[in-house]
């Protein structure tokens, strides 16, 4: 009888192999100061964790304020304190140390430097995004490009450089890459609709007080606009209930804890970013990951945990 059990065990191990660490999804979110704030990426994380395939996934926000994919920086950026950082200065470290299986990248807002359309700037953005995708895929990671959000959505009459139209061109190019097999999540149409609806209900609603950085409700709008495409690419249900209140506060605090730890671990050249804890001291995924939506799921998250946010 004992020998029979011994013979059966190898067969069972073949039929039901143990899950290796490599099978756990490892998601890297890249971008500028808007995703760095943590709100919409943390909402996206909460949506992913509501699905069994991503409940215990590693999800880290590597976004960095001021950053571009193009490598461009306007003269006197940040009053001359430092040039804009470029994701390509630190991408190799992220890919080699974190080893993502999926990269979600949202660039463009800084790449045109808030200037009128320039063919040279546009080409630098195109090359930067193409290079980013190629590097991610060469590291065996899937790649999802997210279009840049809106500029001066509350006061378009003040957009003298017609920069939102420049971002339309950048987004249009990304959408055109779908014909080449790119996975692209276009937030701009859904975001525009939500802002328009919010202003119809409340003429005093402000999406982004400075024209660039959304408030908490704006981040929720971005998450709602990005989620359907990301869910489709990952074969997840399109419906999602985003958390709010204390449930979201816990997710955001943990999200930012992991963000700063991994930014410190992989390195960057951007001044003003708080140092993170050593990654060895980060909590285990199941201990901090909440997947429960609050009683008013979908309401705008409360303005918490953004004390480490820095401008573009």
Where are these regions (language model features)?
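A short helix->loop->beta-strand "cap" motif at the edges of active sites that frequently abuts
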Residues: 137-142, 182
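Hydrophobic h-region of N-terminal signal peptides that target proteins for export
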Residues: 11-19
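Solvent-exposed loop/turn segments at secondary-structure junctions
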Residues: 33-36, 64-70, 102, 108-114, ...
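Sec-dependent signal peptide recognition
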Residues: 2-11
């Amino acid at each position: 009888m004992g020998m029979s059990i011994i013979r059966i065990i190898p067969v069972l191990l073949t039929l039901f192999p143990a899950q290796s660490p490599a099978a756990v999804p490892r998601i890297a979110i890249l971008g500028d100061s808007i995703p760095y704030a943590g709100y919409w990426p943390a909402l996206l994380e909460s949506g992913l964790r509501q699905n069994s395939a991503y409940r215990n996934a590693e999800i880290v926000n590597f976004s960095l304020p001021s950053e571009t994919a193009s490598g461009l920086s306007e003269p006197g950026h940040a009053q001359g304190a430092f040039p804009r950082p470029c994701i390509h200065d630190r991408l190799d470290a992220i890919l080699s140390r974190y080893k993502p299986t999926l990269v979600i990248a949202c660039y463009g807002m800084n790449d045109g430097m808030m200037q009128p359309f320039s063919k040279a700037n546009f080409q630098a953005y195109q090359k930067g995004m193409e290079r980013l995708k190629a590097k991610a895929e060469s590291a065996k990671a899937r790649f999802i490009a997210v279009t840049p959000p809106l500029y001066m959505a509350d006061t378009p009459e003040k957009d003298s450089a017609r920069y939102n139209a420049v971002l339309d061109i950048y987004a249009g190019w990304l959408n055109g890459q779908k014909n080449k097999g790119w996975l692209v999540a276009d937030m701009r149409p859904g975001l525009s609709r939500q802002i328009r609806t919010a202003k119809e209900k409340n003429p005093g609603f402000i999406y982004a007080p400075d024209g660039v950085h959304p408030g908490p409700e704006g981040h929720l709008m971005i998450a709602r606009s990005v989620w359907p495409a990301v869910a489709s690419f990952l074969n997840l249900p399109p419906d999602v209930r985003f958390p709010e209140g204390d449930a979201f506060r816990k997710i955001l605090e943990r999200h930012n804890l992991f963000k700063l730890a991994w930014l410190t671990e992989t390195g960057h050249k951007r001044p003003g970013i708080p140092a993170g804890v050593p990654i060895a001291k980060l909590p285990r995924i199941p201990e901090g990951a909440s997947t429960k939506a609050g009683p008013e799921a979908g309401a705008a998250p409360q303005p918490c945990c953004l004390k480490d946010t820095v401008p573009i």
